């Protein structure tokens, strides 16, 4: 179900060309390959993720139609994957605006997904991008581990503003390197003279 919600958001945000090209799905992790030529910005990925989570929170019930003819499914506006082979009778799975032909397993309502977190976005071939994501408790565990790392950094750096503290450390390090190079040159110059 989460792949369907992601697919809908990709098409809404990137355009109708963003069609599914493959996927691997298990209960807490999935990867989703789709057609698109450019990397997706972090800001846009966050917006896509927010929209998928907003849909999850709406608790939209599964609307499933079985034994539907291909022509009836087309008439209903169900998304069909180009090049995919379908039987004469198909299953249409709908969650709100998302309506696709599908033979996969689905939740009874979107809220059963719990949480959706994009882990990565990358290129897998020319014109094909991949999003890897986690759902449910796996997504929660990932976010919790990240939160714990942030807390540990706050303790180590003695600040809540981790970015500023790291920038200060990097600048201090750069200044020390510059001073060190200057001292090495002076020392070498003194040895020669």
Language model features with spans:
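Ordered, soluble secondary-structure elements with a strong preference for glycine-centered loop motifs
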Residues: 1, 38-46, 140-144
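Active/ligand-binding-proximal structured segments within catalytic/core domains
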Residues: 1-34
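Short, well-ordered alpha-helical packing segments
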Residues: 3, 7-11, 49-53, 132
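Non-catalytic interaction/regulatory segments
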Residues: 34-124
């Amino acid at each position: 179900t989460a792949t369907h919600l992601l697919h809908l958001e990709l098409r809404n945000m990137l355009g109708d060309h963003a069609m599914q090209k493959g996927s691997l799905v298990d209960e807490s992790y999935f990867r989703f390959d789709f057609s698109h030529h450019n990397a997706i910005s972090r800001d846009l990925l966050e917006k896509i993720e927010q929209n998928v989570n907003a849909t999850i929170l709406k608790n939209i019930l599964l609307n499933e139609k079985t034994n539907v003819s291909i022509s009836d499914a087309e008439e209903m506006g169900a998304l069909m994957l180009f090049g995919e082979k379908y039987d004469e009778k198909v299953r249409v799975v709908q969650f709100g605006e998302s309506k696709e032909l599908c033979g996969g397993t689905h939740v009874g309502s979107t809220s059963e997904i719990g949480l959706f977190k994009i882990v990565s976005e990358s290129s897998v071939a020319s014109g094909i991008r991949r999003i890897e994501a986690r759902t449910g408790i796996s997504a929660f565990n990932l976010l919790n581990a990240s939160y714990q790392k942030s807390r540990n950094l706050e303790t180590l750096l003695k600040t809540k503003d981790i970015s500023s503290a790291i920038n200060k450390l990097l600048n201090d390090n750069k200044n020390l390197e510059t001073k060190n190079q200057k001292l090495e040159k002076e020392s070498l110059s003194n040895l020669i003279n």
